[in-house]
C-alpha cells in the first residue's frame, strides 16, 4: 500500500537485492558493521540491507522520494529494456546466471555469521540446512542432474532463491545441456 512502511524480513531478502541503495537511510552502527564486514562478494547495497534485515532494522517506505532517471521510464536496470526476449533468454540460460542466487545466498549467510553472531547462533541449524541445500543446488546445475533439480522443488529453500518460473528455467537449462551433448 502506498505511503506505508514495511519491515523487510531477512529470509525474504536472502538471495537477491530487492532494494537498491539509491535512497537509503542508515544508522551509524549499521554503517560501521558494513564497513567492518565489507566484501566484494556481495553488492554494497545488498550487503547493507542484508545486515540491517538480520537485525530486524530494514524497512521499505513505499513512497517515491525523488526521480532517479536512467531513461524516460524512471526505472533502474535499463539494459533489460534494450534486450530482445531471445537475448534475455540466452543470457539467463547460462550456468553463471542459473547459480547466481544460490551463490549470493551463501555469501550473505557467511557475512551474517560474522556481522550478527547472535542472529546466526539463533538460526544456526536453519542456516546449516540452507547452506547444504544451496550447495547441492549449485552442484545439481553444474553436473546437469535433472532429477535432483526436480526433487529440489519439494524443499522450502528453493523458493528463497528462485521463482517458479526460474525453477522451470533451471530444468530447461539442464535438459538443453543434456540434448546438446
Kindly label every feature range from the protein language model.
Residues 2-81:
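Conserved nucleotide-sugar donor-binding catalytic segment
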Amino acid at each position: 500500500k502506498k505511503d506505508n512502511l514495511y519491515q523487510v524480513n531477512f529470509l525474504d531478502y536472502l538471495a537477491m537485492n530487492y532494494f537498491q541503495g539509491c535512497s537509503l537511510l542508515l544508522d551509524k552502527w549499521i554503517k560501521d558493521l558494513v564497513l567492518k564486514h565489507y566484501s566484494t562478494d556481495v553488492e554494497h547495497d545488498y550487503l547493507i540491507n542484508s545486515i540491517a534485515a538480520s537485525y530486524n532494522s530494514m524497512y521499505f517506505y513505499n513512497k517515491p522520494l525523488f526521480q532517479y532517471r536512467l531513461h524516460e521510464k524512471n526505472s533502474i536496470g535499463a539494459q533489460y529494456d534494450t534486450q530482445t526476449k531471445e537475448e534475455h533468454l540466452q543470457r539467463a540460460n547460462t550456468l553463471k546466471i542459473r547459480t547466481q542466487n544460490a551463490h549470493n545466498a551463501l555469501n550473505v549467510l557467511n557475512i551474517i555469521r560474522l556481522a550478527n553472531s547472535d542472529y546466526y547462533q539463533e538460526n544456526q541449524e536453519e542456516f546449516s540446512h540452507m547452506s547444504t541445500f544451496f550447495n547441492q543446488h549449485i552442484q545439481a546445475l553444474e553436473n546437469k542432474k535433472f532429477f535432483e533439480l526436480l526433487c529440489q522443488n519439494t524443499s522450502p529453500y528453493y523458493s528463497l532463491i528462485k521463482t517458479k518460473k526460474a525453477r522451470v528455467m533451471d530444468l530447461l537449462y539442464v535438459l538443453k545441456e543434456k540434448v546438446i551433448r
